[in-house]
Amino acid sequence: KRIPTRVKTWQMPAFSAIADTIAFTDTAMLNYHDIDWQQRYSMSSTTNGNVLVSPIASRIVQDRLYTIDDPFAWCWSPYVVTPQQQRYFNTTTPFSSVAYKKGFVSGHEENDISFLFTGNIGKPLNLGVEMDYLNSVGHYANTAGKLYRGSVWGSYNGAHYSMHASFGWSQLSSFDNGGLQDVTDLNSSLNPEDLPTRLNAMTAYRYLSGYLHNQYAITKEREYTNSIEVIEDGKRVYKDTIKVEHIPLMTF
């Protein structure tokens, strides 16, 4: 019998560990317009010149991310895997996604490679891994950026006990225009493109995170009717089955 593919996705956005269902991962048929890193972050952003792996801040205050404890690293938030942003899955069949995107515009070379695999071991236990590699070359000389990002996770959701665990890492580097070598050149007769600039400015950032949450729930059983489709004597018929679900009354 063919098992239908169903994928559930959620996050633990707060340390109170209340699960929050989110949109399914980007696919060719679903949410593909959100696959761009900057557009996924905000529809209106300010960057430092590179299309990918550049310090970024949303012009829309409500869209800004403050998931990193260090205020000086908030500009890297969209590229970092934090425990609050970690996605957890539950699938009826193993799910994998491999994508490669490349920008062919002259002077703005971009490479974006992503990989995701997740699957269940039984109904309650799920394991998965996700990795991303970004590489971009900016319009000006000596501007470039790289990002290596990944995470591994596991979740167990039983009738009474649940567990979520994850480990994420992000490592990025960005070479940018470091500004004018001498600000007094602004008063000179040089054209803007001829002003001497610092071309060796570099930013490197590494972020590691680990997360583990255990929860136990006192539940109440409730029966409900579920209709299933079966074939009898060459005919398709529907039969009702009685199933039991557990309604949480109190969690610890």
Positions of predicted regions on the chain:
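Surface-exposed extracellular loop regions of Gram-negative outer-membrane beta-barrel proteins
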Residues: 111-151
